[in-house]
Amino acid sequence: MKPGIHPEYGKARVICACGETFETGSTKKEIRVEICSKCHPFYTGSQRTVEARGRAEQFKKKYGL
């Protein structure tokens, strides 16, 4: 590696929108994220599933068929 051309790699503080902070390695000092493992639905278990009904199912439900 050539000396003097690579950015400094050090500890970086990651700040989530939910308020959680943790440290990782990066060339930046501070990283802001919108979602992390503390607030992501997959990790918290609050994941919702969306049921999409087709037009035929809606018709059957509406008219009791």
UniProtKB/Swiss-Prot annotation:
One of its GO terms (cellular component) is ribosome. Disulfide bonds: none annotated. Zn(2+) binds at C16, C18, C36, C39. Signal peptide: none annotated. Binds 1 zinc ion per subunit. Keywords: Metal-binding, Ribonucleoprotein, Ribosomal protein, RNA-binding, rRNA-binding, Zinc. SUPFAM superfamilies: L28p-like (SSF143800). GO terms for biological process: translation. Its cofactor is Zn(2+). GO terms for molecular function: metal ion binding; rRNA binding; structural constituent of ribosome. The keyword rRNA-binding applies. It comes from the Bacteria. Belongs to the bacterial ribosomal protein bL31 family. Type A subfamily. Part of the 50S ribosomal subunit. Binds the 23S rRNA. This is Large ribosomal subunit protein bL31. It comes from Carboxydothermus hydrogenoformans (strain ATCC BAA-161 / DSM 6008 / Z-2901). The lineage of its organism: Bacteria, Bacillati, Bacillota, Clostridia, Thermoanaerobacterales.
